[in-house]
Amino acid sequence: MPELPEVELTRRRLERELTGKRIDRVVVRTPKLRFPIPQELHVSLPGRTVRSVGRRGKYLLFDCETGWLIVHLGMTGFLRLVAGTAPPGKHDHLDIVFADGTVLRFHDPRKFGTVAWTTDAPATHPLLAAIGPEPLTATFDGAYLFAVTRTRRVAVKQLLMNAAIVAGVGNIYANEALFRAGIRPDRPASSLGRPECERLARTVREVLQESIDQGSTYRVEEETVAYHPLNFDVYGRGTDACTRCGGALEEIRLGNRSTVFCPRCQT
């Protein structure tokens, strides 16, 4: 699943390539993904110019003069820039065709992605209104994390993956941040002390920023997108040896998600 770094890299590429371009038409091949694709796109988008591409959590926000196109890539989705002559594939559900012939194509095999349209401020849209602070901003720090964990006994990893607590932290980077912070993922969030919250807020920022930095060669137009450029310490490593102590990692399920940690290094 594309997480915050992958969405941010997509945003940067699309803003660089699409800002200032005028939309000619919209082609919808699959009327319903996670939710129905708004019919008004056929009327609202043609003739409009992309002014910027923003991001809120894992959502991409296209400023199209009179409104905002909101896109979530879901579990398997990605956006490609292709030539207008490129034939669509089986899972290419939406094309936004620009006046210069460029096509922004939404590919999503599992159809869990979302496309929405709003003429109001994006922050007020139901998809975005309840999202928590961005983890790479000053509003997400140890003091904030300490405050929101006081009454929550849910596992700390599940708390990190709750978009209402912090935006855009998924399974991959929650695993990695907790390892760096030395905190077991299944610990009740309320058991964390202030120093642990400070440490965890810092490692969340570190793993996200490092992944963005290492993904500088990410290319949104490639069909086989190389997500997750970070060299992982625990994610996807099952019972391999810990990169820090050499002991065996453990794999458990939390919230129906695979969770890997080191029982020696994380307490």
From Swiss-Prot:
Annotated Gene3D superfamilies: 1.10.8.50, MutM-like, N-terminal
FPG-type zinc finger locations on the chain: 233-267
Active-site residues, record numbering mapped to chain: P2, E3, K58, R257
Presence of keyword Hydrolase: yes
Entry keywords, A to Z: DNA damage, DNA repair, DNA-binding, Glycosidase, Hydrolase, Lyase, Metal-binding, Multifunctional enzyme, Zinc, Zinc-finger
Cofactor binding mode and count: Binds 1 zinc ion per subunit.
One GO MF term: 8-oxo-7,8-dihydroguanine DNA N-glycosylase activity
Stored PROSITE patterns: FPG_CAT, ZF_FPG_1, ZF_FPG_2
Names of required cofactors: Zn(2+)
The EC number(s) this enzyme carries: 3.2.2.23, 4.2.99.18
Catalytic function, reaction form: Hydrolysis of DNA containing ring-opened 7-methylguanine residues, releasing 2,6-diamino-4-hydroxy-5-(N-methyl)formamidopyrimidine; 2'-deoxyribonucleotide-(2'-deoxyribose 5'-phosphate)-2'-deoxyribonucleotide-DNA = a 3'-end 2'-deoxyribonucleotide-(2,3-dehydro-2,3-deoxyribose 5'-phosphate)-DNA + a 5'-end 5'-phospho-2'-deoxyribonucleoside-DNA + H(+)
Disulfide bond annotation, renumbered to this chain: none
Positions bound to DNA: H91, R110, R152
CDD domains listed in its UniProt record: EcFpg-like_N (cd08966)
Function field: Involved in base excision repair of DNA damaged by oxidation or by mutagenic agents. Acts as a DNA glycosylase that recognizes and removes damaged bases. Has a preference for oxidized purines, such as 7,8-dihydro-8-oxoguanine (8-oxoG). Has AP (apurinic/apyrimidinic) lyase activity and introduces nicks in the DNA strand. Cleaves the DNA backbone by beta-delta elimination to generate a single-strand break at the site of the removed base with both 3'- and 5'-phosphates.
NCBIfam families referenced in this protein's UniProt entry, alphabetically: fpg (TIGR00577), PRK01103.1 (NF002211)
Quaternary context: Monomer.
Record protein name field: Formamidopyrimidine-DNA glycosylase
Gene source species: Geobacter metallireducens (strain ATCC 53774 / DSM 7210 / GS-15)
